[in-house]
Amino acid sequence: MEAITIEIIIIILTISYPILVAPQLLYNYPFNCKKGPKMTLDGLTCPLDFNTFNLDSKDNMEAGTMCRPNPLSKDIEDGFLCYKDTWVTTCEETWYFSKTVKNHIIHEHITKDECFEALATYKLGKHVEPFFPAPSCYWSATNEERATFVNIQPHGVLLDPYSGKIKDPLIDSDNCDNDFCVTRSHQTHWLRNRKPDIMERCNNETWECHPIKIYYGWVSKKKNQETSTTFNYVQTGLVIESQYIGHVLMADLCIMTFCNRDGYLFPDGSWWEIKYSLYHAFTKDHTVLNNAHKCGDRTHGDHLTEFQRDKKVGYEDLEINLEGLEMRQKSRSINMMCLNRLAEIRNTHHINVLDMSYLTPKHPGRGLAYYFSQDQKNSSKYHVKVLDCDYKLIHIHDADIKGFVNITKYPEPNVTILGLKDNLTFADLGISRCQDLTPLNGSRNISCEESSGPLHSDDSRLSNGKRFWTRHSFQGANFHEHPGVRIGVNGITYDIRKQILRFPSTSNLLWDLPSYYSTKHRVHFFQHPTKHEIRKNFTGSDSRDIDVLDDLINRHINRTDFPTRIRNWIGNIEDKVEHFFSNVGGTIKTIISLVLFVIGTLISIKVWKKCKRHPQKTKKVAQLKLNDYEKTYNQRDTSNNNNDDLYETIENGGTVYSPFHV
């Protein structure tokens, strides 16, 4: 068999690798945007890699079409978030009537039965909004009041009509028990209300269609012989190529019936009906597509076994193409960079415009659009909000390799929708032209046109008859840190002073990166629906900081609660006593301390003086006693001497006296 060379020329890698062919850029732009779900950190995910090629082949190929139902605005499935909170109020009162009130919220475990019971109550209009119980304070005691509420919040989700699964950043669709799903918020569940009717999609006159090319792939086989090396080529199977879906191997498809029509489920999860004429290469085997297995035969996207590979119509090892290999390696690198960025965002809660481009969907269809929102109550903090949009590939004419478009240099229209040939202006995309009229050293003065894309209520239709609106597609906003620059969805920026639009991607941001693309912004993600409600309802006009709101859950805040005007006269007395002790308590303590210090000092001095006099008195008494003793002793000696003289005198008289003498 003669070798047939298939030359694949890379034109575009949609968002990831936009390459200019003539001066134009292919960009995945959001249309028909609606308010999206409340974003959480866990809901941020990296998009699916998506490659598109343009085929230049000398082999016979078949031209065909691929069609599918249009994504409908009714693909939103009604549902509710269900969670149980215990709102706790604690009052601690001291002996001198000083009170400290603490509020905190505890997320309780909730069962499926409790959720459905609360949903029935909600539909009857008897749902009670949560609140903190009134504090009950008792003298020299700590008292706690609790109130438990089962909360129900409406939360519509995007439904994948082909798989019947939910696509929502808050809900784990793989962890659902019928109509009861686990969410990524703590102790929070999602309840399905009703499934939408899919019969409206089955009218094929309203389906969207795109041209495709189908051809056989070839693989070169190297055979080493003793004297030489030869190459032969083996036909592997069918390849389908479209600038809308990229270059897809038939080995990656499986058969799936939708709307009672046979079609194929693609790797990105989309369903398409493939139509082609049976000529040339396919006349010899026009049933080759029917050899594919049904989607239920294997988990879609898993690696094929050898047995399954034998039953498929193509192989993954198409003819080696260095450009294609290089692009796949770059695609993997971009995906790794996105994962690293995502880890950094979750750890630091900081995000920049460049990060937005990594999160942007890479293929047409339903997807989320990300944009910054500055906190109205604290301009130093930002939120990341999302829109639920229908993405379409558009040609942006006269854009350079950096993604720049000078909107004053080229005449409008400058945009063409791929496959539909609809010519649009930038105003049709929702990007209003603005002028910076700010004088030197003056206050900011920016004037913009009123038209910012068609509204949902307008009768704006494309050439295929489908309605479209872009009033919220750009969602541009001005920030104090970046004067003269409007930052829109997915990192699209509008430099008003230079009149330059920039459509960012993960490849063209490597050139001349402006400082505002890399500036980190502190972003806040509400991780639980309770915080949304507190922020919206509980605080009212209070400009309480977001970080304080975080402390309301599983922690507490302290505040002194004085008696109000409706308290009785006993409460007023308590208030006065508390006020008195609060103001003079410190002074009284100081005075008492000084008095005690003075008294202690005086006592110490007196004791010291007494101790100083006591040793002298003791010495004098001892001396006196010694003198008396010596005097007595001397007297005794004198008396003895006198007696001796008496006896001597008597004896000397010649007469001796004897008492016994008769």
UniProtKB/Swiss-Prot annotation:
Residues 1-16 form the signal peptide. Disulfide bonds join 46-338, 82-115, 91-137, 202-259. It holds the Pfam family Rhabdo_glycop_FD. It comes from the Viruses. The chain crosses the membrane at residues 580-605. InterPro entries: Rhabdo_glycop_CD (IPR055447), Rhabdo_glycop_FD (IPR001903). Keywords: Clathrin-mediated endocytosis of virus by host, Disulfide bond, Fusion of virus membrane with host endosomal membrane, Fusion of virus membrane with host membrane, Glycoprotein, Host membrane, Host-virus interaction, Lipoprotein, Membrane, Palmitate, Signal, Transmembrane, Transmembrane helix, Viral attachment to host cell, Viral envelope protein, Viral penetration into host cytoplasm, Virion, Virus endocytosis by host, Virus entry into host cell. Its main location: virion. The keyword Signal applies. Residues 606-662 are intravirion. Glycosylated by host. Attaches the virus to host receptors, inducing clathrin-dependent endocytosis of the virion. Homotrimer. Belongs to the vesiculovirus glycoprotein family. This is Glycoprotein.
